[in-house]
């Protein structure tokens, strides 16, 4: 089974998007793949699913959170290398239909 790491950056109010984001990814993203979610946030994560790995990320004002996106993601490079695929999806993105690995990789 292919393995997919999916990154979410949600600090401050953007952490509120995590539950619906995660739910839509679980339902529609890469069926048949083992998924691990790398969640970068400054907030508290309580009762999170087992397939979420949290990373602390200080809240940065616009535009710095976007400008430093790749530096943020690189902090998880060792874990990302364990996966067959890696994908970053915006925190306010919701999947509404199935997305197969062959559609994006």
Features from the language model and the residues they span:
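N-terminal anchoring/stem segment of glycosyltransferases
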Residues: 1-65, 78-82
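Generic preference for flexible, low-structure residues
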Residues: 22, 41, 70, 102-105
